[in-house]
C-alpha cells in the first residue's frame, strides 16, 4: 500500500501544479543558455550536483525523522530555512503553492489523517514549502524514506524535462533519454544526501536565481511566475 501511495504522490497527474513552472528554463532557452539536448541535460545534471534540489531532499529526510521522534518544532525551523533560501519571489511562491496544495489534498484523501496534518500545520503556519509537505506525507503514511526521496527527485526531473520538451523544443524520445541517462546521478545524489549533516547543506543556484528574475520582464511566457 505504501508503495502505491508513493507512486500516487509523485505521479504527474497528482494535482499540485508542478507542470506550471519552468524554474528559470524559459529565460535560459530564450537567451540560448539551454537551447539543445546537450546543454539542457548538463543544466539538469548541475542542478542534481549543486542545486537547491539536493538540500530539499535532505530536508525531506529531516522532516520524516522529526515527526518520527515527535520533534514538531523542526517543521517550523526547516520551513523557515527553505523560505530564506528561495532567492526570488517566483521560486518561493512555487514551493509554497505546491506545499499548501499537497497538505490540503492529503487531508482530502484520508480524513483520518486530518488531526495529524492539523498539528503539523499549526507548527508551520500559513505557508508550507513543498519539501516540508512531502516529508510530512512520507512520515504519516509510513513510506520508506529512501524510496521516497528517489521518487521526489525523479518527479522533479520529469517535470523539468516535460518543460524542456515544450520550450526548446525536444522530441518525446529525446526527453525520455535525458531522464534515463540522469537516473544514475539521481541515485548518486540520494546516496550522498542521506549522510549529510546540517552544516553540510548547500546550494549554488545564482544562475537559476538570475534566470528566474528575468522571467518578470520576459515578453513571452508559457509557464507561471
UniProtKB/Swiss-Prot annotation:
The keyword Thylakoid does not apply. UreD, UreF and UreG form a complex that acts as a GTP-hydrolysis-dependent molecular chaperone, activating the urease apoprotein by helping to assemble the nickel containing metallocenter of UreC. The UreE protein probably delivers the nickel. One of its GO terms (cellular component) is cytoplasm. Required for maturation of urease via the functional incorporation of the urease nickel metallocenter. Keywords: Chaperone, Cytoplasm, Nickel insertion. Pfam families: UreF. InterPro entries: UreF, UreF_sf. Transmembrane segments: none annotated. It comes from the Bacteria. Belongs to the UreF family. This is Urease accessory protein UreF. It is found in: Cytoplasm. GO terms for molecular function: nickel cation binding. Its main location: cytoplasm. The keyword NAD does not apply. It comes from Picosynechococcus sp. (strain ATCC 27264 / PCC 7002 / PR-6). Disulfide bonds: none annotated.
Amino acid at each position: 500500500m505504501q508503495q502505491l501511495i508513493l507512486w500516487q504522490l509523485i505521479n504527474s497527474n497528482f494535482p499540485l501544479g508542478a507542470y506550471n513552472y519552468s524554474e528559470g528554463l524559459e529565460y535560459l532557452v530564450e537567451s540560448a543558455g539551454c537551447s539543445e539536448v546537450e546543454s539542457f541535460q548538463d543544466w539538469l545534471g548541475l542542478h542534481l550536483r549543486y542545486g537547491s534540489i539536493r538540500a530539499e531532499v535532505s530536508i525531506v529526510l529531516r522532516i520524516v525523522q522529526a515527526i518520527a521522534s515527535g520533534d514538531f518544532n523542526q517543521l517550523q525551523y526547516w520551513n523557515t530555512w527553505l523560505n530564506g533560501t528561495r532567492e526570488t519571489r517566483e521560486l518561493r511562491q512555487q514551493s509554497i503553492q505546491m506545499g499548501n496544495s499537497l497538505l490540503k489534498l492529503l487531508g482530502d484523501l484520508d480524513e483520518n489523517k486530518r488531526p495529524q496534518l492539523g498539528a503539523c500545520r499549526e507548527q508551520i503556519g500559513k505557508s508550507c514549502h513543498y519539501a516540508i509537505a512531502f516529508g510530512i506525507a512520507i512520515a504519516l503514511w509510513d513510506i520508506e524514506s529512501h524510496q521516497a526521496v528517489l521518487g521526489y527527485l525523479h518527479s522533479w526531473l520529469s517535470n523539468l524535462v516535460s518543460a524542456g520538451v515544450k520550450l526548446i523544443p525536444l522530441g518525446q524520445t529525446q526527453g525520455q533519454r535525458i531522464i534515463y541517462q540522469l537516473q544514475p546521478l539521481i541515485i548518486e545524489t540520494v546516496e550522498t544526501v542521506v549522510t549529510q549533516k546540517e552544516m553540510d547543506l548547500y546550494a549554488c543556484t545564482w544562475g537559476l536565481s538570475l534566470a528566474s528574475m528575468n522571467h518578470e520582464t520576459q515578453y513571452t511566457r508559457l509557464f507561471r511566475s
